[in-house]
Each structure stands twice: as C-alpha cells, then as structure tokens.
C-alpha cells in the first residue's frame, strides 16, 4: 500500500471512530455566551487550545467555519484530513517548521472571514508553553483570543509529550471558555511579549 492510500485509509477509519465515539459523549459548555455574543456582532476570534486537549475541542467546534493550524510533519497530514472532514479549513505549519508561512496563512484565513484556531504548544511541545504565534496573529488581524479547554469525566491518556486526552465512551465532556482577550501592541515583536499573559489566562481555564 503506497503512502497516499495508507493515509486515506487511516483518515477514513479515524473519522468513523471519532464520530462513533464522540456521538456518545455528553457535552457541556461553560462560559460560552461571550463567544456567542462576539460572533453575533461580527467579531472574529482566534481559539487557543493546548495540544493535548485537541480531540474533544475539534469535535466541539466542528462545522463552524474555523481555520486551524496543523503541523507539516507526516502525522499532521492525517490530522489535517480528519479536521477537514469535520468542516475545518487547515493551514499547514508550526513554530518549528513552516511557522512563518503558517502564521501568514492563518492571518489570511481570518482576513477572509473565518475564525482561527491554534495550539500554541504544538506540534512537539514543550507542553503547555505558549508560543507567540497566536498573539502575533491576533495583533495583526484584530481577532480576539478565545482561550478554550476541555476535560472529561472518564478518559484515556496517551503516553505522549502532551498526554493526549481521549474521552471514553459516554463520558461527560466539559468545554470551558476563558475571557476573550485582545492583543494591543505596536508591532509583532511587542505583541509576542503578551505570550506569558495569555499562557496564564489559558492555564486558569478549567481543563484536563
């Protein structure tokens, strides 16, 4: 089996498994009204989420005209195709490879009218350390950063750098939003200095 066919097969099976598993979850949203109000007013947002909580958050925000940054490594191709099957637009790149191109692509997607999403600690960590790409994109586009976290009443944890969270069947999955946060700065370099503040805000949101 060549690589293209292998990836296509993994994606097809993965999407089926995710839909089957996630359809059993009991979803609960906490503090979602500020996001809804911002969207009603036409204000765009940039979701910031830790990589380890990606799966339940991909499911929660599916089909909502969101462009998400996915890494360019081989596993990223599988994740990108799964995300696209759930209704996301994808921008390829990361902080370690293709980062500038990914940031430009994300800003173009936001300028085109989509919300954005980024894992500021992805794709390889260190876990829960907020890289500056999200704050630079928010400063350049005027999007508000929407911190978003997930937790589950019962879950598996992978033995990966991010301790990837997979809620078990019929788990109660809680998606919590932090305060929508603007990034006001005179330059991208000045915007990047806001990263520790955004890390503290994201860490303060209840999650796994």
Whereabouts are the PLM-identified features?
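Non-catalytic C-terminal accessory region of glycerolipid acyltransferases
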Residues: 1-24, 39, 62-67, 85, ...
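A short, well-structured juxtamembrane/interface segment
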Residues: 19-44, 50-56
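Conserved beta-strand termini and adjacent loop/short-helix elements that scaffold enzyme active sites
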Residues: 30-32, 71, 93-96, 178-180
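Short, well-ordered alpha-helical scaffold segments within catalytic/effector domains
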Residues: 32, 51, 76, 100-107
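Residues that cap or initiate secondary-structure elements
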Residues: 33-35, 53, 74, 124, ...
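Short amphipathic alpha-helical segments and helix-helix/interface helices
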Residues: 35-36, 58, 80, 134-135
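Catalytic core of membrane glycerolipid acyltransferases/transacylases, capturing the structured
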Residues: 44-97, 157
């Amino acid at each position: 089996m060549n690589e293209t066919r292998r990836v296509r097969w993994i994606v097809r099976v993965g999407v089926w498994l995710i839909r089957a598993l996630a359809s059993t979850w009991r979803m609960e949203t906490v503090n979602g009204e500020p996001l809804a109000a911002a969207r009603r007013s036409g204000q765009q947002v940039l979701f910031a989420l830790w990589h380890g909580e990606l799966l339940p958050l991909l499911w929660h925000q599916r089909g909502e005209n969101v462009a998400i940054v996915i890494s360019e490594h081989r596993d990223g191709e599988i994740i990108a195709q799964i995300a696209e099957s759930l209704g996301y637009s994808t921008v390829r790149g990361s902080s370690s490879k293709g980062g500038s191109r990914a940031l430009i692509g994300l800003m173009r997607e936001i300028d085109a009218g989509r919300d954005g999403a980024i894992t500021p600690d992805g794709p390889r960590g260190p876990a829960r350390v907020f890289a500056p790409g999200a704050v630079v994109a928010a400063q350049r586009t005027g999007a508000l950063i929407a911190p978003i976290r997930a937790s589950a009443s019962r879950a598996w944890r992978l033995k990966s750098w991010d301790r990837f969270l997979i809620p078990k069947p019929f788990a109660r999955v809680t998606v919590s939003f932090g305060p929508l946060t603007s990034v006001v700065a005179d330059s991208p370099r000045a915007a990047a200095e806001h990263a520790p503040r955004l890390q503290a805000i994201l860490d303060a949101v209840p999650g796994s």
